[in-house]
Amino acid sequence: MASNGADRDPEIDRLLEAKARELTKKMKYSGVVELSKENFDDFLKTFRVAVVDFWATWCAPCFMLEPIIKRLALEMPDVGFGRLNTEEEPEIAAKYYVMSLPTVIIFKDGEPVDQVVGVVPKKILQDRIKAYLED
Amino acid sequence: MYPVLLGINGMGYGDFTECYLEVLPRLMNMVERGVLENRRPQYPDKSWWSILNMEPDPTPTGDPSSTLLVKLTKATLVNIPVVNPTYGAYSIRLDATTPYDDEVNGVVNTIIKSAGKSPVIASITAPDRFLHSNGSIKCSVYRAIDNAIGQLLNSGLSSFIIFSPYGEPISPGEGEHEDYGIYIATISRPRHYDTVKLYEVGILFRDLTESVQSSGP
């Protein structure tokens, strides 16, 4: 039997609304998000675990890593995946001490917890990310 | 062997790992590597005129052998897609009639024959001819090219620029490719923190040829 509005628990409504807001925000950041100073902090806040690929147009290995990041984004929907062009946003790269490219930084609750420098096989990157989803 | 400029139309770095290539990734770690930038729309003829004329916005000339780069380097041209059929010592139609492995083998054998006598400027068009409409064969095409480059290196090639005038096809549309292609060479790129521009490839090949000829082939 369908319930009418009077039967609804306001606490459940509040939780559902919060969940809907969270999902809407995550949908905004689906796939691999192009990051900039405008959306970087909001992106990190949206996901418990987020992965940022720091790259540049002149960096050949960065282009080798790009499809690996794209595939991981499809396979790990609970994780946020973003790319930051270090030429366009040098301040953000400097803030996280990115000295070599490509560098992938894994963030948990908005804080950097791990980083991988250079091109690595998908499995290695996936395992490193999974470790932060489990604890 | 004299220096070789080998352009592979429509190849990108993106699937080097996915396709389990062996030669090109190892080569990247041994010589200069970079990224070639050429913005959409990219067409084979316009791109190659830019290289041969060493100009960003070239005026196509009727005879590829009379272009500035060919005059300066005295290079043999092989399968250059400025006209259809392609121009040079090996030539094919720019459609699907020549299988990718036939083209790759034909170009490589012609390079090996020619590079003992003069510098060579050559092109492989297979990724551009096939991958706009059939992405599923990408790894087969890439592996054929990877093997062929191994064959070139085994034949004694030691001075080269291997590049793509533009990246992978991204749609069935002819001029639609990734803006970034490969650059793997025995000559340093002009600026470390920048991409290599298309017209600079001709200038770099002239410099490479001059430096090799001044010290003997």
Predicted regions and their residues:
Chain A
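Hydrophobic anchor residue in the Rossmann-like NAD(P) cofactor-binding loop of oxidoreductases
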Residues: 86
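Proteins that catalyze or organize thiol-disulfide redox chemistry
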Residues: 1-51, 57-63, 67-80, 90-91, ...
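Conserved residues in the N-terminal Rossmann fold of short-chain dehydrogenase/reductase
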Residues: 83
